[in-house]
Amino acid sequence: MKNFLLILCMCFFAYAPVYAEDMDLLSDEMLLGSESESSTTDKKVEDADEKTSQDEEGGSFFGFIIKPISNLFGSGDKITEVAEGEKESPFERSVRQANEGSLEDQMSLGYMYLYGANGLDADMEKAFKYYEMAAKQNDPIAMNNLGSLYFSGIGTKKNYDKALSLFAKASELGNDNASLNLAFIYLTGAAKDPVRNKKAFDLFEKSQQAGNKIAEFMLGYAYYKGFVVDVNYAEAYKYIKEAANGKAQIDEAQLVLADLYTKGLGTVQNYASAVKAYRAAANQGNMEAILKLADVYAAGTITPQNLVLAHALYNIAAAQNITDAAQKRDELNEKMQLEELTNAQMTAQNFKSSPSELTKYIRQTYGYNIRNYIDNNMIVSSKK
């Protein structure tokens, strides 16, 4: 029960898809010679999101709550100031209109109080108040976010029953984030309950159909593992590829996609695409991908051998105490020249991961390995 509550003490907020720039340590020139890779750079994270993402290692209660549903205020506007010739400040007007029932203002005020934006001091109780007002208008986004506040005890006492009720209502109204939140809740605690598993699968499917990329990966992974449904690698490849590419760039999707390409499951075996997918996940700091990519470059079987990069990658993984990484790194020492070792050390030392915004959101909200939600609920058939 303690583990159940600890895992669930997270903020299931809807998120806004903004994406971080790729790193260039493991660049095309270093890894695959002249092979080019499309950039996933879109735009920089806004100030409020940067504030929450700095706490990535320990997780953040605030995740990436959805932005205000309107453009009422710019990110730098000081809304408490009264303009010349005006009777009230933008803030006073927004409060008045929120009290008069304006959903737009209720959502914006809830967001600004939660983040302490636009000249307002952060006030969790007021954030809760305005999201509650918006939720009473049956707005699914407000319901989902209010459920998150109840779930985490932000601005109010924790109330799991109210949180789940709000998530369920928001899901019924088509909110893909609420459906996703419910699915993860059903899979928390590794109950291995076929009824809960089926509900989770259906919710992943519902959320994916609404365009949620996290749900798309989970649905693909369910087909990959044979979770609730029979194993179907073609379906797995279809969904996982979408979650790995485009603007989503989910690191775990890239990792599994690389495995599919390596083994030729659901698609034609393609080692170049496998290496490219491993690299993409490694650039986001995915330690499994870093270790697998190191193995690939050390072996030199599916891509040209590169002991410098293999050593650097093992070193990066070893610094995170990844099993066998230090041993594999040390085994390469005897095969490398001093200059190569120096280059490898510098490469590892300069490494800085650059997770996509969606990857950061997943890590902050659901953890660093969301595949475990399915893996830990797999039911092994007793039939022989």
Q: Whereabouts are the PLM-identified features?
A:
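Classical Sec-dependent N-terminal signal peptides that target proteins to the secretory pathway
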Residues: 1-22
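N-terminal propeptides/low-complexity segments immediately following signal peptides
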Residues: 20-69
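N-terminal segments that cap or nucleate solenoid repeat domains
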Residues: 80-115
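Structural signature of tandem alpha-helical TPR/SEL1-like repeats
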Residues: 84-92, 120-130, 157-166, 192-203, ...
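Canonical positions in the second alpha-helix
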Residues: 97, 133-134, 169-170, 206-207, ...
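Short helix-capping/linker turns of helical repeat alpha-solenoids
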Residues: 99-102, 116-117, 136-139, 152-154, ...
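Hydrophobic face of amphipathic alpha-helices that form TPR/SEL1-like repeat modules
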Residues: 108-115, 120, 145-152, 179-189, ...
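Terminal, low-structured helical/coil segments at or just beyond the last alpha-helical repeat
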Residues: 324-384
